[in-house]
Amino acid sequence: TGTEAGLSTRTIAKIAKGEKLSTHSLNRIAGYLNVAPELLCRKEADNKILQILRDEKEIQLSGGLYHELQVRMTYNSNHMEGSKLSEDQTRLIFETNTINMGDGIPVDDILETVHHFRAIDYCIDIAEEKLTEEIIKKLLYMLKHDTKDTAFPWFAVGDYKKRANVVGGRETSKPSEVARDMRALLERYNARDNVTIEDIIEFHAEFEYIHPFQDGNGRVGRLIALKECLKNNIIPFIIEDSKKSFYYRGLSEWRREKGWLVDTCLDGQDTFVKLLDILEIPHE
């Protein structure tokens, strides 16, 4: 009981009401239960959306924000890159971990869908951490491991590209330049005190200009944007497959006209806001 643990009636009343306790009281309870104090409490995120995602992820709540973010972002991000899975099929995989193989879906599309679910989990788990090369490489590895790409030694799953590539006819950083360019990009970005959604969009565009990986750059870039929005208490954006022509135009024209990509990402933020409204989650 509370008195056996050496707690005052006032402290017991606080526990009953779910109010905050002092460190001294927590240590007393932990000592009585013979457990570490940190096992009795958890740190809550300042970002309400991030905390909701973590709470729902922990209990695998169906039909909430976490559930819908997983399905909608995974479907749209993968479909933009050529996945043949429909949104309904993506939802089925998330909800039941099964799919009708009679649909003729490539195995890699299924694998990369499951991997994308785990990559979103990772972004939610480490949202507050400083963005690093290691985090970015891990996101690529999470997406591409065990796919057919791992059969090619030059593909370098989980590492920077070994072969030069072009995107939409546009030159990207050469393999010998990628590490230098990524370090410079991260140094500039992490030096900012108050990150805005425009800063995150700029990072996203410059990341795509570097195109550091052999494949998976777009999905990794959009996952980074999710993580950084959650870190900086900014409503995330989901680029819908139906808007991909505007999105790709915005990326290709970024260094000449920034407004196209910014407008497309803000439209994606409106998509997320609509989801918050449907679920009656307050937002600013």
Locate the predicted segments by residue:
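FIC/Doc superfamily catalytic core
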Residues: 42-284
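DNA major-groove recognition helix of helix-turn-helix/homeodomain DNA-binding modules
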Residues: 24-39
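Recognition helix of helix-turn-helix/homeodomain-like DNA-binding domains
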Residues: 6-21
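Short alpha-helical "recognition helix" segments of helix-turn-helix
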Residues: 1-3
